[in-house]
């Protein structure tokens, strides 16, 4: 059985392991390593995840393994890598294929941008490959698909750009959810009830978005001289649409520095 090695044990690694370990453990032997990989032991025990913790000594043995990089981008050169990997899957924001190949020897490279919805196998993940190899590519992509859906893009820079739509976007949507909850409280709902209503609204919206374009959803809800169009006019006047676009742009720009 192939080995899938996670280098890194932070929030993203934990989200992916939580959402995908049952599928991945049927296809791979799971390893976790990094500077202090023992830190993830309580999490593995709590979630009943079968993975081998490999202490870091002088170098990380990557030979003939599928290697998933899930640490901070600036730590790429902090490790020594021994051998040639079959595939390097990188979730390192702003790190291109050249930097990856300079640091780690591998037959295949894949850049991806997952998000923390991976813990429910609901990540929407942009991916781009360097020199695709049919059998290796298939297995590497199956790793990504184990924690959500996989959207291929034609250039590595577009993976970084996807932080606007599926990376930072979840934090921005959390701000929206919190604002709607507080709006409900302002109008007289208690905090618990308001949050429950917002949760279901998001679930319903997600279903609508599967079938409808955003502008069509707006059109179906708004009525002439109605309450919703009155509220939307305030949001447009305050520049909310432009603020979201600019916030996403700033996030992508920051990542590319």
UniProtKB/Swiss-Prot annotation:
A GO cellular component annotation in the UniProt record: cytoplasm
Protein name: Pyrroline-5-carboxylate reductase
SUPFAM superfamilies registered for this protein in UniProt: 6-phosphogluconate dehydrogenase C-terminal domain-like, NAD(P)-binding Rossmann-fold domains
One biological process term in Gene Ontology: L-proline biosynthetic process
Role of this protein: Catalyzes the reduction of 1-pyrroline-5-carboxylate (PCA) to L-proline.
GO molecular function term, any single one: pyrroline-5-carboxylate reductase activity
Annotated family: Belongs to the pyrroline-5-carboxylate reductase family.
Primary location class: cytoplasm
InterPro entries attached to this UniProt entry: 6-PGluconate_DH-like_C_sf (IPR008927), NAD(P)-bd_dom_sf (IPR036291), P5C_Rdtase_cat_N (IPR028939), P5CR-like_CS (IPR053790), P5CR_dimer (IPR029036), Pyrroline-COOH_reductase (IPR000304)
Annotated compartments: Cytoplasm
PANTHER family, per database record: PYRROLINE-5-CARBOXYLATE REDUCTASE, PYRROLINE-5-CARBOXYLATE REDUCTASE 3
Record NCBIfam families: proC (TIGR00112)
Pathway membership, UniProt: Amino-acid biosynthesis; L-proline biosynthesis; L-proline from L-glutamate 5-semialdehyde: step 1/1
Keywords tagged on the record: Amino-acid biosynthesis, Cytoplasm, NADP, Oxidoreductase, Proline biosynthesis
EC number annotated for this UniProt entry: 1.5.1.2
Pfam family of the protein (one): P5CR_dimer
Catalysed reaction equations from the record: L-proline + NADP(+) = (S)-1-pyrroline-5-carboxylate + NADPH + 2 H(+); L-proline + NAD(+) = (S)-1-pyrroline-5-carboxylate + NADH + 2 H(+)
